[in-house]
Amino acid sequence: MAQEKKAADHIKSTYRQVDLVFGTFAFSKLYEMLAEVLKEKKRVFNIEENASEIDEDFYQLRENKFSAFVPIMYGCNNFCTYCIVPYVRGRERSRTPQAVYDEVKKLVGEGYKEIMLLGQNVNSYSYGFPALLRKLNEIEGDFRLRFMSSHPKDAGSDLIDAILECDKVCKHLHLALQSGCDRVLKEMNRRYTAADYMKIVDYARGKKPDFSFSTDLIVGFPGESYEEFCETKEFIKKVKFDNIYSFVYSRRSGTKAAEMPDNISDKQKGLWLRELLLEQREVSEKWLSRFIGKKCRVLVDGKGKEEGMLTGKNDENIIVNFRGGEELIGNFADVAITNAMNWALKGELIG
C-alpha cells in the first residue's frame, strides 16, 4: 500500500478483518510477514517511513533474456503538485554504486544486451549519477545502457558530458518537460523554467547536433489557458523531440493539484491533446528524416506486424522495422535506414 503511516493506522483500527498491511519499503520482507500472520496468528502492520537500507538480495523477475531493468534508487523527494509518488513510494533511497555495478556486470555476463537504469529521478542519485554511468561504462561486453527518468532541475552539462563520453550509454535523454509555460511549471512545482530546459537541449545539441530527446507532457493542468497550452506547442517545435508521451491531466486524490479548481472540461482536454499530437507528428516526421541514408545499430526485440518483418530500437530509442530472420531476435543488427515515418524508421539489414 501507500507509504503512509496514517493510512495504515486507519485500516488497523477500522478494518479488524485485515491481517497484513505493509508499505513499499517492506516488500522484501513479505515471506517473514506472511509467516507471522499464518503461523503466529498475528496482525502485521509494517510501514517503515524512514527506512534507509535496501535489500540487495531481493529477487527480480526479468521479462526477457536480452533487456533488463536495474533500479538504482527508490522513492522521490520532489513533490510535484500533480504527483502521488512521494506519498506512496516514500523518500529517495539510493543503492550503492558497487551494488549496481555488480548487478549490471552479472546481467551482462548472462548475455543481456540492454540495461535500463531506473529511478523516479536518476539525477538525484545520491552517489552522483554521471559518475555511476562512467563506472558502468567500464564493464566489458557488447551491451548498451539506458536510463529513466530525469528531472530537468537536476540535469546539467555534467550529465550530457557523461552520456557523450561513454560509448555504451545511448545518446538519448528522456527529460520530462510537462509544460512549456513557466506559470504552469511553477504551479506544478517543477522548479525550472522553459529557458532552463532549453539550456540543456542547446548544450547537448552544441556537442552533438542530432542528440535525441523525448519527453512527457501534461495537457489541461488546472488553471491552464489555451494561450499557455500553445506555449507548450511552440516549445516542442523549438526542441524537436523525437517522441513525446502526452496525457490529459487527471486528478489524484492526496496531491496539491487535487485542491486546485479544475476549470477545463474533459472534452476540451481531449481536443488539446489531439492538437498537441498533430503538432508533434509534423515535428517527428521532419526530425526523424535525419536518419535516412545512415546506419543504425538496432537491438531486435521481436517480430514486426508484417510477415517476415522484425522490429527493435536504435540507440536513440526509436522504433526500427526491417526484414530479417527470427534468429536475430535478442541480438544487435546493423540496419540502413531507407524511410522515416512520424513514429518509426524503416530500413534494410546490412550483411
What are these regions (language model features)?
Residues 19, 42, 142-143, 211, ...:
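A structural micro-motif
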Residues 259-351:
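Terminal RNA-binding accessory module
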Residues 63-66, 76-78, 169, 179, ...:
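Short flexible coil/turn linkers enriched for glycine and charged/polar residues
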Residues 80, 100, 117, 147, ...:
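Conserved, mostly hydrophobic/aromatic
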Residues 126-142, 188, 249-282:
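Radical SAM enzyme [4Fe-4S]-AdoMet core and its adjacent flexible, acidic
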